[in-house]
């Protein structure tokens, strides 16, 4: 309702239906989700294989060859690293950054280890090894800052401060739902739940599925591997970090300077920097409305880790004045 003002009841009903459709199946309306079985994704976010879905000017992704929008790039496959990330973050730095991860009160005690991180990181070409030393350090700081926010056990008066308590949690707290969305491409396994696990708290079958395929693990049938195998756990987070989800760039490309904002990005104040990474991860809830405590928590971790690694945070670290990547999508389809 906040996008357009309608006075006629019929217009309100049309908007309601469009909103329901816009988040239904694929494309920018569904966070970059892809259609199963080779079907086309229409401009309105539905999957199909007729001209209404695949025809020129009617298809936004997974389109037939020929004129039309470019399909979403494939998920990057982990490969040999072009350098050694241990030159950027040592074991002692890792322990200093995640100082209280092994506290007795932390659910993830003794799970997140330096060796597991290094093993996982070396499986992804370019992670922590792209660009000059400044860019490499910022990527490591940004990755651990965002994942520390997702797994934090800190509070304002915590020993050593709230930003020394990243990686305290391993599984989503409370009584989470199954996070199963009907999908022929990534079907949920009987009895399995796809709630948040690991450093990035990966959720939903449509994330566990492609992540597992990329790292060589059947996470649809065994999602808890993300919470029982530390290398797999770190790989799930790095996979998310390295993977673009249209219309969003990858976190990796943003922090390493490989992403160039479009005119629409610039108009939305989405400029290169740590703030865009927060926008990628949770911009729909946290960005675009001024100061937000969750955003400030992410920034607090980032500043601390940059200090430990000996690098400046760079520009545009907040997203309070940025529009989320999903804002305005309804207008673009009308």
UniProtKB/Swiss-Prot annotation:
Which intervals of the chain form a coiled coil? Answer: none
Instruction: Write out the annotated subcellular location.
Output: Vacuole
Compositionally biased intervals (Pro residues): 66-79
Documented EC number(s): 3.2.1.14
Q: Which family does it belong to?
A: Belongs to the glycosyl hydrolase 19 family. Chitinase class I subfamily.
Leading EC class: hydrolase
Q: Which GO terms describe its molecular function?
A: chitin binding; chitinase activity; endochitinase activity
A Pfam family: Chitin_bind_1
Active-site residue numbers: 150 (proton donor)
UniProt modified residues of type 4-hydroxyproline: 73-74, 76
A GO BP term here is: defense response
| Disulfide bond entries | 26-41, 35-47, 40-54, 59-63, 106-168, 180-188, 287-319
- The question of whether Nucleus is a record keyword is answered with no
Main location group: other
Q: Which organism is it from?
A: Nicotiana tabacum
Swiss-Prot/TrEMBL catalytic activity: Random endo-hydrolysis of N-acetyl-beta-D-glucosaminide (1->4)-beta-linkages in chitin and chitodextrins
Organism superkingdom = Eukaryota
Tell me the segments the record calls region Disordered.
Answer: 64-84
Propeptide, residue positions: 328-334
Keywords for this protein: Carbohydrate metabolism, Chitin degradation, Chitin-binding, Disulfide bond, Glycosidase, Hydrolase, Hydroxylation, Plant defense, Polysaccharide degradation, Signal, Vacuole
Q: Which GO cellular component terms, listed alphabetically, does the Swiss-Prot or TrEMBL entry include?
A: vacuole
Q: What is this protein called?
A: Endochitinase 3
As given in the record, the signal peptide range reads 1-23
Q: Where is the Chitin-binding type-1 domain?
A: 24-65
Give the function comment from the record. Answer: Defense against chitin-containing fungal pathogens.
Q: Which InterPro entries match?
A: Chitin-bd_1, Chitin-binding_1_CS, Endochitinase-like_sf, Glyco_hydro_19, Glyco_hydro_19_cat, Lysozyme-like_dom_sf
Mod. after translation: The 4-hydroxyproline residues are not glycosylated in this plant vacuolar protein.
